[in-house]
């Protein structure tokens, strides 16, 4: 398609007029919260690394205060840098702040507007949320504990077998971020992915070698965290660019291609589940159960996207597919990220690690593995997990909200349509709330004389951290995530001595610096890049118990009708 000079001139006029109106409107509606000075039309766009914005946002928080106003092109952004501001706006006033500023490429194109994470607040989102909350809520999540128990035993076995593999200097990340098979990152990822896959589709990830399904999940996750980062594409911050013809909008073809790639994977899982349901084979996950209920209501065949318009509001096929994929992606990636950060921080703080071992030996000993009954008996371990989530939140900026109407906070205007970011990173780095915030200090959360709660629920008072978000957008999967963190990390501390390799030339430990931004990936999720860790059984008795437990687990899989592990 050819674009004439007149068309380009019209486009330039539209863009210029949009910028003028935007700034004129902003001037008339002052006072806005304080913030850095920008340049006409582009605002602060060139002052922020779009793929890693949270370090700059922290600097602005320290300079301008708890609420900062910035402009990213045509997008007005309000950054909330204190727990008080975030709690007041995103929780107390959640009716006004529960929508999303959906990234155009990630939401409209890649997920065809079916990704729950970025759905605007409305009927469709409420229907999806109701189904998800019923699946992941406190009561339902306890039913997952048997699976978490069994899958965590498989982790111990795999680390026992491949505990020294990850130390090799040749065992490094692939050119596109691929994690080598048998690397301890892959072993952890298999656990989190298998758990979510069983929950959604009724089948396990039962191999760590030659398992394209596991690699595909993380390829999709990696791509999604990059394309969904606010500001990743100019069209996300200049909505007027969405009107451009295809020849001038390369992101459009790129996004649609990504959608086809995703649906090639997620769509096959969905269709296989439907076939298994019709054949009466396999176990039920969420998808099979939902499709059965839908069929019993006379709505067996619902192609397309969105929900039905009747009172029942049944999710159509593509929305069911993306609801399942969203839970798998979020539950797999963020939980494994927290586990990688825990190991990094514990190795970087050997005194905290040694104290965790001593507590484990005193409470559990070597004659059994830690179990759910030990959760309140291991306050130091639990404090270490909480401090990990504070010091290295998987999503430093959470997922942005959007205000539906003008609002005023502390005398400052928050305009309708603004993107509103709960700056988890700035809140967690607040030196008043968390003295010496860059230090790893589990004693912040160590209360051995009290019955321990994770204290991370939607109740805003006395929250330890904010990684699960705020208000009506609070993460439904927190109970499953917290349970996984406890059972896996407690057993890891119980069963193994952790160590890191040394550089052959310098003799220095090959452990990345947690204070170096380059240690973590960019994009929506900040995960440690792969690093070498060895896992040595703490004794022969521990090793034999891990082996025996793994053998017992195979009998459990068989009795449950699930695939046994192939090693």
UniProtKB/Swiss-Prot annotation:
Transmembrane regions listed in the UniProt entry: 3-23
Membrane topology of the entry: Single-pass membrane protein
Please classify the protein's predominant subcellular localization into one broad category: membrane
UniProt keyword annotations, A-Z: Glycoprotein, Heme, Iron, Membrane, Metal-binding, Monooxygenase, Oxidoreductase, Transmembrane, Transmembrane helix
Residues binding heme: 475
Q: Per the entry, which co-factors are needed? A: heme
Would you say which domain of life the source belongs to? Answer: Eukaryota
Q: Name one GO molecular function term.
A: monooxygenase activity
Write down the CDD domains for this protein, in alphabetical order: CYP64-like
One GO CC annotation, please?
Answer: membrane
Indicate whether Oxidoreductase appears among the record's keywords: yes
Q: Where in the cell is it found?
A: Membrane
Q: In which pathway does it act?
A: Secondary metabolite biosynthesis
Q: What is its EC number?
A: 1.-.-.-
Q: Which Pfam families match?
A: p450
Glycosylation, residue list: 81, 223
Q: Which protein family is it in?
A: Belongs to the cytochrome P450 family.
Q: What does this protein do?
A: Cytochrome P450 monooxygenase that is able to use anthracene, carbazole, pyrene, and phenanthrene as substrates for oxidation. These multifunctional properties against a series of polycyclic aromatic hydrocarbons (PAHs) suggest that CYP231 would play important roles, at least in part, in fungal metabolic systems involved in xenobiotic detoxification.
Protein's recorded name? Cytochrome P450 monooxygenase 231
Question: Organism source for this protein?
Answer: Postia placenta (strain ATCC 44394 / Madison 698-R) (Brown rot fungus)
